[in-house]
Amino acid sequence: TFLTPEENGHVTSLWGKVNVEKVGGEALGRLLVVYPWTQRFFESFGDLSSPDAIMGNPKVKAHGKKVLSAFSEGLHHLDNLKGTFAQLSELHCVALHVDPENFKLLGNVLVIVLAHHFGNDFSPQTQAAFQKVVTGVANALAHKYH
């Protein structure tokens, strides 16, 4: 795995406290607010007309939970992220034509949301470990694009 045992400890310890539904919904919502061009992939989700509409949109929250559940699964397979995310990579590349840069943006937003939710418990060491993980996941999701 690309994490040191200490980094893995930081990730595992914090992730055990994460509310996947709440954090996932907030992370995807913030992505859509901060990077509005990403909304084009979610036109079927209904009202995305304002930050409040986006953050309160049940479809955004539900998809955010789905995204973070997949991310959570990836945490159990850090030694094989490309294999773990191969199908999702293909779906997003071939069928949905998502710009792979968006995976990096979502990873960065996730780190911000975790910092927001966990405050002082989200130490610089924990942030560094999570940044490695979200970068690894983004690269795995972008794999089918190459």
Swiss-Prot record:
Molecular-function GO term, any one: haptoglobin binding
Any single biological process term in GO: hydrogen peroxide catabolic process
Signal sequence annotation: none
Residue ranges constituting the Globin domain according to the UniProt record: 2-146
Modification Phosphothreonine occurs at: 12
Annotated binding of heme b, by residue: 63, 92
Family annotation (Gene3D superfamilies): Globins (1.10.490.10)
Phosphoserine sites (modified residues): 44
InterPro entries, sorted: Globin, Globin-like_sf, Globin/Proto, Hemoglobin_b, Hemoglobin_oxygen_transport
SUPFAM superfamilies: Globin-like
Keywords annotated in UniProt: Acetylation, Heme, Iron, Metal-binding, Oxygen transport, Phosphoprotein, S-nitrosylation, Transport
Tissues where the protein occurs: Red blood cells.
Quaternary structure and partners: Heterotetramer of two alpha chains and two beta chains.
Protein name (database record): Hemoglobin subunit beta
Gene: HBB
